[in-house]
Amino acid sequence: MEERFCRTAMLIGEAGLVRLKAARVAVFGIGGVGSFAAEALARAGVGRLVLIDNDAVAASNLNRQLVALYSTLGRSKAAVMKARIEDINPAAEVEIVEDFFLPERAGLFFRGHYDYIVDAIDTVAGKIGLVMEAKKRTIPIVSSMGAGNKLDPTKFEVADIYETSVCPLARVMRRELKSRGVEALKVVYSKEKPRKPLFALREESAEKGGQAFSKQPPGSISFVPSVAGLILASVVVRELAGLTLE
């Protein structure tokens, strides 16, 4: 047994470690939620990871994203995350796709089989498209709902999308998925009522087909999206390792 995973084996067993090492997991979105999900998956022993994000590290990411350091400003988030994971587990196979997910170009993002997909995309259209693609290909997926404008990480829960409440993003997702005939989707969502930002802020984004546009971002803090990402990873690890919570 590899020393770096011996403590993990005490919880999930050697058979669980073997399953994780053989698994190929895709993380869509390497931001405040996705960066923590990706690193937790790597530290748990997932052997093959595909990281999808077309964004570069910005100063506004420093308050919450694992990839954000002064030394990484301006660099590709996916590339920074890949280097970080390889420094944690040099044996891991890490691929990156530095592009924005669009359903009409799904083939670029689904090269080879995925055992699980983590949806940490922060646009409704992207999330809907990814869920539909995963369902079409019968790939397990867990999706993050809204983590912005919140201060209480203890309010996160894992539930089916149709059992969610409070979260505005989950409300939109319920409506859109129902209209498309999707019967179930595992999500991580918060029951905390979103706070109204104390002031408005505009920032450039590259999330519309790779073209920059101005948007109003939500308020964020270090200890909320990170927890959502860790919960996403926990769902994936338990299911891939064949574990259940008592």
Model-derived regions, located:
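Glycine-rich phosphate/adenylate-binding loop
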Residues: 2, 112-113, 126, 136, ...
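Hydrophobic/small residue at the entry helix of a nucleotide-binding pocket
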Residues: 33
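Short, well-ordered coil/turn residues at beta-beta hairpins
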Residues: 120-121, 144
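Glycine-rich phosphate-binding loop and adjoining beta1-alpha1-beta2 segment
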Residues: 46, 51-89
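Conserved N-terminal Rossmann-fold NAD(P)-binding element of oxidoreductases
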Residues: 27-29, 52
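Conserved SAM/SAH-binding loop
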Residues: 98-106
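N-terminal charged helix/coil linker that caps or initiates catalytic domains
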Residues: 1-26
